């Protein structure tokens, strides 16, 4: 009886257990195949620009300076030029901008590239704009404003709008 049980166990193991092991084993001489693919991208030159308001405060006939900041963010190594428009005041130019006040009164002012108020800021690249090269980070550029002396205008609020243009 013992012999019969041993034969029965051996037969059962060969039919059930051991053939299953063959399902998980790799056949002798297994091969692999490989391939490759290209990965590409194009980075376009781009720039973003924003600016803070320039507030002169109260004007009493004396020189009034003020500052604004133009923030330029361009892709790395992208050359750019920042220009400032003449504004919306009647008869304004980039050398003499004009804020409009009560009854269409005009108050002249200037925008400059330097603290000494000697380098006018206009719109002609290579002449009166500010040039730079993008580095991927925001680059702040100071705008120096000034109202000249001895303008005798009506009291009230004066305003203008300047358009900042970044050419790249």
Residue ranges and their predicted role:
Residues 2-17:
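Bacterial N-terminal signal peptides that target proteins for export
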Residues 2-4, 25-31:
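N-terminal short leaders/motifs
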Residues 16-28:
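C-terminal segment of classical bacterial N-terminal signal peptides
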Residues 29-101, 129-168:
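N-terminal small/polar-rich segments of proteins
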Residues 105:
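Solvent-exposed beta-hairpin/edge-strand motifs
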Residues 114-138:
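Extracellular beta-sheet repeat scaffolds used for adhesion and glycan interaction
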């Amino acid at each position: 009886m013992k012999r019969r049980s041993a034969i029965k166990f051996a037969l059962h193991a060969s039919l059930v257990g051991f053939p299953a092991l063959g399902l998980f084993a790799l056949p002798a001489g297994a091969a692999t195949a490989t391939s490759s693919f290209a990965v590409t991208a194009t980075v376009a030159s781009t720039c973003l620009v924003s600016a803070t308001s320039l507030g002169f405060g109260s004007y009493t006939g004396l020189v009034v300076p003020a500052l604004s900041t133009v923030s330029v963010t361009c892709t790395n190594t992208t050359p750019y030029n920042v220009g400032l428009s003449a504004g919306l005041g009647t008869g304004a130019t980039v050398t003499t901008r004009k804020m409009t006040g009560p009854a269409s009164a005009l108050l002249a002012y200037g925008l400059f590239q330097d603290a000494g108020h000697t380098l006018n800021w206009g719109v002609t690249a290579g002449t009166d704009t500010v040039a730079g090269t993008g580095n991927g980070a925001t680059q702040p550029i100071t705008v120096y404003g000034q109202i000249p002396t001895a303008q005798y205008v009506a009291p009230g609020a004066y305003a203008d709008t300047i358009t900042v243009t970044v050419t790249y």
